[in-house]
């Protein structure tokens, strides 16, 4: 049986759409996975799962977005991680450990730290492209907001400065991930 860490371009190539659907179905129903499902389908499903969480693993903040390129240091990485909720921190650490295992086999799987940091920085810090407009029926009447997707007619684009914050935050998160994925990092 082939391990995912031995699969060429794992996390860098999308899995087959039908296989990904079957993986999601098995996860939803608790049924067994098809033994012939590709590692790429599992990897794609994991990325989609992380990217569709109700809140991102690493919340995009002005602080993360405003870091200057040469100021991303191991010490700063520790400060950033101390500010996220413990559950998010644990998920981040578990995935970093797994990605380091994949990098140990880079001669076999063709995967680089830069490529993994690029992919995972986007799913760790994703933001919704649209936000609900106030008063569009999301209020349940008792002050609580419903957790529902908003129809496209009820959304507005985020301001340009918000988009720039997202781009800068994701770029800085990529730099943070490169530090965590490096052989030198002992945090």
Question: For each predicted feature, which ranges?
Answer:
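Alpha-helical catalytic/interaction cores of small GTPase-regulatory modules
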Residues: 1-187
């Amino acid at each position: 049986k082939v391990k995912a860490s031995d699969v060429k371009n794992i996390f860098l190539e999308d899995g087959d759409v039908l296989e990904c659907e079957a993986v999601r179905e098995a996860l939803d129903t608790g049924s067994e996975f098809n033994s012939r499902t590709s590692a790429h389908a599992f990897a794609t499903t994991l990325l989609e799962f992380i990217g569709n969480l109700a809140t991102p693993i690493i919340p995009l903040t002005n602080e993360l977005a405003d870091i200057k390129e040469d100021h991303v240091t191991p010490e700063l990485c520790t400060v950033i991680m101390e500010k996220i909720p413990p559950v998010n921190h644990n998920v981040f650490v578990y995935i970093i450990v797994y990605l380091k295992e994949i990098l140990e086999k880079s001669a076999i799987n063709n995967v680089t730290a830069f490529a993994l940091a690029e992919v995972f920085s986007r799913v760790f810090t994703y933001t919704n492209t649209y936000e609900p407009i106030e008063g569009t029926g999301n209020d349940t009447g008792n002050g609580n907001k419903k957790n529902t997707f908003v129809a496209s007619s009820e959304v507005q684009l985020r301001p340009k400065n918000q988009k720039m914050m997202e781009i800068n935050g994701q770029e800085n998160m990529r730099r943070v991930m490169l530090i965590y994925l490096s052989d030198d990092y002992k945090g």
